[in-house]
Amino acid sequence: MEVTDVRLRRVNTEGRMRAIASITLDQEFVVHDIRVIDGNNGLFVAMPSKRTPDGEFRDIAHPINSGTRSKIQEAVLAEYQKAGEDEVNYEEAGAS
């Protein structure tokens, strides 16, 4: 399984969420609402989740092994870093 596309939208919030991403797996399956979170130990990826009636959050979709989780996290965070660099380059070019 490969992450074949990452679409990312940065968000400006007061909280720790920095972006929302959608990923395409093997050009056949899309997972939306993956969040990039600024945690105590740096950025990490949180899978899409839903609040249950008792207030807990349950993942809607998630990898079942650490290798797949790493692939997804690396792809999403690489796109997040790239989007940040593109934003800086755009601002340096005089656009605002």
From Swiss-Prot:
<keyword id="KW-0131">Cell cycle</keyword>
<dbReference type="Pfam" id="PF04026">
    <property type="entry name" value="SpoVG"/>
</dbReference>
<comment type="similarity">
    <text>Belongs to the SpoVG family.</text>
</comment>
<dbReference type="GO" id="GO:0000917">
    <property type="term" value="P:division septum assembly"/>
</dbReference>
<comment type="function">
    <text>Could be involved in septation.</text>
</comment>
<protein>
    <recommendedName>
        <fullName>Putative septation protein SpoVG</fullName>
    </recommendedName>
</protein>
<keyword id="KW-0717">Septation</keyword>
<dbReference type="InterPro" id="IPR036751">
    <property type="entry name" value="SpoVG_sf"/>
</dbReference>
<dbReference type="InterPro" id="IPR007170">
    <property type="entry name" value="SpoVG"/>
</dbReference>
<keyword id="KW-0132">Cell division</keyword>
<dbReference type="GO" id="GO:0030435">
    <property type="term" value="P:sporulation resulting in formation of a cellular spore"/>
</dbReference>
